[in-house]
């Protein structure tokens, strides 16, 4: 059907053009897709007992995808969420192949038909208010970074922001006027506004 070099060409175009230029995915999502497909290729090469460079487009089958997903959970100990993320990446790649190689349409149809697994939501663990107050009471007060550390913890407690959202925060995102608030840049290139408590704004 093709040659090993053809698979390499499709992979290069998938990551360099399709995901970036056509789908406009974020770098973190592209890295996740890359990791998923890398693991799938390694699994396929081991299954065929061949080198990665010897893999062919015809080796990309729905049967292997199903076995790969089973391998992720049973042998690699991946969570259901991780398994579903890997499946999303493979669905996207198989759809891409089918759009360029009609002979892959049936395989792509079977892969996109693989259902995601449902998992019970993880139990959310949190601190009660008195526990949070105890944390603040025990923060060092005389270190060079005491004010910074206290402000960061209070900001996180106030907003529920992720660590990366705080790291990406810019002065222009803060409004410390009569109604203090902050604009946070979250996952999926989405923005949200969060009010700030007066102690936090001060």
Task: Give the location of each predicted region.
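Conserved catalytic core of the tyrosine transesterase superfamily
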Residues: 1-202
């Amino acid at each position: 059907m093709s040659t090993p070099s053809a698979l390499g060409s499709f992979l290069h175009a998938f990551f360099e053009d399709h995901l970036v230029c056509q789908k406009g995915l974020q770098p973190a999502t592209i890295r996740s897709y890359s990791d998923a497909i890398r693991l799938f290729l390694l699994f396929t090469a081991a299954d065929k007992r061949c080198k990665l460079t010897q893999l062919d487009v015809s080796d990309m089958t729905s049967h292997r995808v199903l076995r790969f997903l089973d391998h992720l959970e049973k042998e690699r100990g991946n969570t259901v969420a991780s398994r579903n993320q890997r499946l999303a990446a493979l669905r996207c790649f198989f759809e891409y192949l089918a759009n360029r190689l009609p002979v892959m349409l049936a395989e792509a149809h079977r892969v996109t038909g693989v259902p995601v697994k449902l998992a019970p939501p993880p139990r959310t663990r949190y601190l009660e208010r008195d526990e949070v107050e105890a944390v603040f009471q025990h923060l060092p007060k005389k270190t060079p970074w005491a004010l910074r550390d206290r402000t960061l913890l209070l900001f996180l407690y106030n907003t529920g922001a992720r660590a990366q959202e705080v790291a990406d925060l810019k002065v222009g995102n803060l409004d410390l006027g009569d109604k203090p608030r902050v604009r946070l840049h979250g996952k999926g290139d989405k923005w949200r506004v969060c009010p700030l408590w007066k102690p936090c704004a001060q």
